[in-house]
Amino acid sequence: MPVFSKAPRILRESVIFPYLAGADFLRWWAGSELRDTMPFGPRMPTSTEQVLHPYRYGRGDVPITLAFDQPDDGALYEDVFGEFDIRVLNAELSKTAEVTTPIAIGWGGDRFRVYDSPDGAALVWYTVWDDQPSRIRFVTSTVERLQKKRPLGYRLETTQPTIDGKPGVRLVLAPVRWTGWDNLPTVHVVKPAP
């Protein structure tokens, strides 16, 4: 396991998460009103938030899907962090030994893009939160920690837009000279099919 222990935390935690958190989720499932079925197909959890907090799954709390309004011209990568990866990021930024999941952080959904630039990668990340206190908690923990760890030559800018009636955060961490600062992408909520 020496190689595993030297891997970046996000890789180590992502390998272990499905087993440990998945086992906890199945223990919850076995005690729920769904115990005579299996969580496959349409019953499969759709977010790490649902796996971490099965009661949210049980009450039908589904993630809010965000999509960028502009085409991904120049984007290297686009995806969702999710609650689990945000927790790993917080643990890494605060240098705590373990990734804790005692309470739901109020994550509603997110979407990010990474762009290439001559001075380094640029991140544009939108999050949407269940309520205003959850957004404030994110800004005063994750965003403030990121600001302190911001690489030299980078700028971190956040705004707090309302996204489809929900409290949101737009976080941009990019080289100071990145040309994308003048034309930041926007997002919208993807409505589920009826």
PLM feature spans:
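Pan-zinc metallopeptidase signature
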Residues: 2-121, 126
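C-terminal soluble interaction/assembly domains
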Residues: 108-194
